[in-house]
Amino acid sequence: MAVEALHCGLNPRGIDHPAHAEGIKLQIEGEGVESQSIKNKNFQKVPDQKGTPKRLQAEAETAKSATVKLSKPVALWTQQDVCKWLKKHCPNQYQIYSESFKQHDITGRALLRLTDKKLERMGIAQENLRQHILQQVLQLKVREEVRNLQLLTQGTLLLPDGWMDGEIRRKTTLLLGQTGVRENLLLFLHRISIIENSIQI
């Protein structure tokens, strides 16, 4: 469902138009598994802790493949996390970028707000290098938005202190019906449209 959502978007007037996402590659854990919560208008139950160990292990593996990996949100990344991301996505210019990013204290939140002008002020003079970084940041933003939408449809909450752990989630009832999912999808599409317009690839 979330991957299909990338092929359309909303303009400021609310009219659907194609989202220009050429060249963006997404690798989403659980891709291709349609959420039962949308079909049934309910959320899947957490498996009972009764049963054989083999059954519990099989249920845990099935649940793991259908959910999004709960990694740290980009906005909470440290300088070190940003440098790891740089090394993976910009290996050829990593030394230059990492020094500049460290000098300017670029954390995850700052990474998401980078612009062409900011990169130029940071000393990255070549336009093609700045555009490469911005393309990678755009892909990161899209992955983050897709993950957030998946977490919303699964009923996982992000609290100020971090992710809810499983025990609290079992005790908390989250009622997010079909209307809530639709509203979240529209919000997601609007955010993607804003991201595309801000980067202007």
UniProtKB/Swiss-Prot annotation:
GO terms for cellular component: cytoplasmic side of plasma membrane. Expressed in the brain. Keywords: Epilepsy. GO terms for biological process: cell surface receptor protein tyrosine kinase signaling pathway. SMART domains: SAM. Residues 77-143 form the SAM domain. SUPFAM superfamilies: SAM/Pointed domain. The keyword GTP-binding does not apply. It is linked to Epilepsy, familial adult myoclonic, 1: A form of familial myoclonic epilepsy, a neurologic disorder characterized by cortical hand tremors, myoclonic jerks and occasional generalized or focal seizures with a non-progressive or very slowly progressive disease course. Usually, myoclonic tremor is the presenting symptom, characterized by tremulous finger movements and myoclonic jerks of the limbs increased by action and posture. In a minority of patients, seizures are the presenting symptom. Some patients exhibit mild cognitive impairment. FAME1 inheritance is autosomal dominant. This is Sterile alpha motif domain-containing protein 12. The gene is SAMD12.
